[in-house]
Amino acid sequence: MPSLVRRFQHASTEEQPFELNIQMESPPLVMYGNPDVSSGALASGLAKLTVFPADLKCESIVMEFVRIISTKRPLRDSCPDCKAQVEAFEKWEFSKEPTVYTHGTHTWPFTFIIPGHFPQTTNSPFINVTYILKTRVKIPSQPDFVFEYPLNLKRSIVTNADKIAQRLFPPTSLIALLELPPVIHPLSCVPVEFQLTGVKPENSKVGWRLTKISWRIEEQIKAQINGCSTHTGTKKPYIFKETRLLGNNEHKSGWKEDGDRIIFEIPISTSLLSKPICDVSFDGQFSLYIAHQLILETIVVEVMNSHPINSNARILRMKVNLPLTERGGLGVSWDEECPPMFNSVGPSPPAYEQVARSSPTDIPLPPPSCPTNVQRD
């Protein structure tokens, strides 16, 4: 199976007669499972240096895997440590000593594992999380050349069993039941089965009629921005809270009544223009919490003999946590991949020693056979 190849390069100029290229050979970087149980993502690729007609002398070539957590609202605008937290986790020294590279392409392979507890790449209104491969090339009598290749790290939670949520509404006899997928994905439409039981209680002339069902998906963002180690305590941390509407709809018909219960399948989805952000949670100098909820509201009217009673209506509201993650693809993490099995391959050919010992002269020949149908004169 051919590998997935992604390239990103920096074009050369007349003052800089070389080109840097990062070729990723690993599949998309997806961490499967929650942060406390995920095994992370495996990244591998090639770093390529293409030198044009003139030889290139480099003092060193170093590449690092860097995570940058930045904010748009720092406590101190003039302090770079208050604006961003930069950490390097992996380092490759492709060239430690001064080396002359001739015309052509020079490659260095690299591979590393991104821990599963790392937050995925996130772009929120308050805090951003980015990952890059940062390559630094030192050339004599010239400023250092820095090349940054962005990495898109995702998280996916793969589960098969649906989630069931139940809610009682005392003092009425109504019971609401929701059966929905355990997670949803951005820009996807998923079915949610809604059941409302107790609309026609036994031995009672009073019942309930469903008039409207409405739903909405909300995204809750909570962020706390602290100062760096130098400015901690000089100002109070900034705390931000925001609730965004990702999708909503309402229905006034379409459900089915089956005796004492009402059944309705509701398609829910996020809007194309909402730009949802996947669930994420981490603490530290920059703390961020993003979660999603499905809010379902139904309006029921009390009736007697199919006639309303003094317009006695009730609003029944349910809130269910609805995690939003990226699609899982094959859903197999790097540590669960099994090597190919070749059960159909036959035994290996004989060794050369056995062939040399059994030469053709050692093989006995069968005795000659005499013809039996020869007539003599």
Swiss-Prot record:
GO terms for biological process: clathrin-dependent endocytosis; ubiquitin-dependent endocytosis. GO terms for cellular component: clathrin-coated vesicle; cytoplasm; cytosol; nucleus. Coiled coil: none annotated. It comes from the Eukaryota. SUPFAM superfamilies: E set domains (SSF81296). GO terms for molecular function: protein-macromolecule adaptor activity; ubiquitin protein ligase binding. Residues 345-377 are annotated as: Disordered. Pfam families: LDB19. This is Uncharacterized protein C1F12.05. It comes from Schizosaccharomyces pombe (strain 972 / ATCC 24843) (Fission yeast).
